[in-house]
Amino acid sequence: MLVGKISGYEDNTRSLERETSEITSLLSQFPGNTNVLVVDTNFTTLLNMKQIMKQYAYQVSIETDAEKALAFLTSCKHEINIVIWDFHMPGIDGLQALKSITSKLDLPVVIMSDDNQTESVMKATFYGACDYVVKPVKEEVMANIWQHIVRKRLIFKPDVAPPKPRMTWSEVFQPVQSHLVPTDGLDRDHFDSITINGGNGIQNMEKKQGKKPRKPRMTWTEELHQKFLEAIEIIGGIEKANPKVLVECLQEMRIEGITRSNVASHLQKHRINLEENQIPQQTQGNGWATAYGTLAPSLQGSDNVNTTIPSYLMNGPATLNQIQQNQYQNGFLTMNNNQIITNPPPPLPYLDHHHQQQHQSSPQFNYLMNNEELLQASGLSATDLELTYPSLPYDPQEYLINGYNYN
């Protein structure tokens, strides 16, 4: 296993050395041994380009006639390495020269022109031009014109390739940004192609042009809300309203584009709004007792009030009238037209066990005393009670216990 690894390492080393030596030999040939043919009708332009390229050790030949230039290439095809031809050359223009040279001589051709129209650049590239430059040609462009020759030769020598750039450990283990790389699932629907080059850190993503359109948002206008209320009345009120029936009713009113979810959401908001508006109105109109009457039923009416006296407080049968309904206003016992008891009623007498047995065993009190006899026995009169408790809303005589001595 170790021998195989060493052998593979040696093969890679020899391949790298061979590629490096061949590239070094190519670099030694340029630009000093480069023969260039420049074809243009403007003789001044030719002289200027020739003078500049000679500074970079190019061997330059110039020609103002297209046919003579093409004949010169045919006669000395092994001496010219690259051709620069004017796009608007009379007789044989740049496109015709491209067709002839690339098919017969297979030389790199650079097209130069006074304009840089997209159509001209596209045609020149389509017919095989290796570059398209605008006149006057810049000096740095002419200085590096030899690169097209090297590129052409590398195409015919696929085994010769430039050495791979050495990568540092930080570049090798540099994580790819997660937000640029789509994962399996839904993210793949948003990307057409992915290009990731770890050597130079290039990361390119092309997004899809077509995206799913967003659904239009439903807006409840005043007119549409009125139609909504009419539909609720038609189906029998808010208690019977449901989204499915409301949608059908609104569609019958020729309202288009409304969905069940729209109606359900609006119906929920409408019910909440009704509840919020109903509670303050009840509180303001009827008071707290009416608004929350259901929470305290013991305060409503005489049916829920215990108006009888326990049997162990009475020596004999006693009949008491129930408190009238009109004595309770808003669930409170009104005293002196206020809801606060200012003068408490007389306390009920306390009877211990001895007195209770005495009164129960005494036969002389086993009859019902009327009010006059009770007042005479106690020494009190109705006038005294009224003066003592002038604001009582009930008759004190009704609550006097028969047979009890109040003196």
Curated annotation (Swiss-Prot):
One Gene Ontology term from the biological process aspect of the record: regulation of DNA-templated transcription
A GO molecular-function annotation: DNA-binding transcription factor activity
InterPro entries in UniProt: ARR-like (IPR045279), CheY-like_superfamily (IPR011006), Homeodomain-like_sf (IPR009057), Myb_dom_plants (IPR006447), Response_reg_B-typ_pln (IPR017053), Sig_transdc_resp-reg_receiver (IPR001789)
Major location category of this protein: nucleus
Motif Nuclear localization signal, chain ranges: 214-217
Expression across tissues: Detected in trichomes and siliques.
Cellular compartment(s): Nucleus
GO CC annotations on file: nucleus
Record's keyword terms, sorted: Activator, Cytokinin signaling pathway, DNA-binding, Nucleus, Phosphoprotein, Transcription, Transcription regulation, Two-component regulatory system
UniProt cross-references to PANTHER family, sorted A to Z: TWO-COMPONENT RESPONSE REGULATOR, TWO-COMPONENT RESPONSE REGULATOR ARR19-RELATED
Function: Putative transcriptional activator that binds specifically to the DNA sequence 5'-[AG]GATT-3'. Functions as a response regulator involved in His-to-Asp phosphorelay signal transduction system. Phosphorylation of the Asp residue in the receiver domain activates the ability of the protein to promote the transcription of target genes. Could directly activate some type-A response regulators in response to cytokinins.
Record note on quaternary structure: Binds the target DNA as a monomer.
NCBIfam families according to UniProt: myb_SHAQKYF
Similarity field: Belongs to the ARR family. Type-B subfamily.
Protein name: Putative two-component response regulator ARR19
Species per Swiss-Prot/TrEMBL record: Arabidopsis thaliana (Mouse-ear cress)
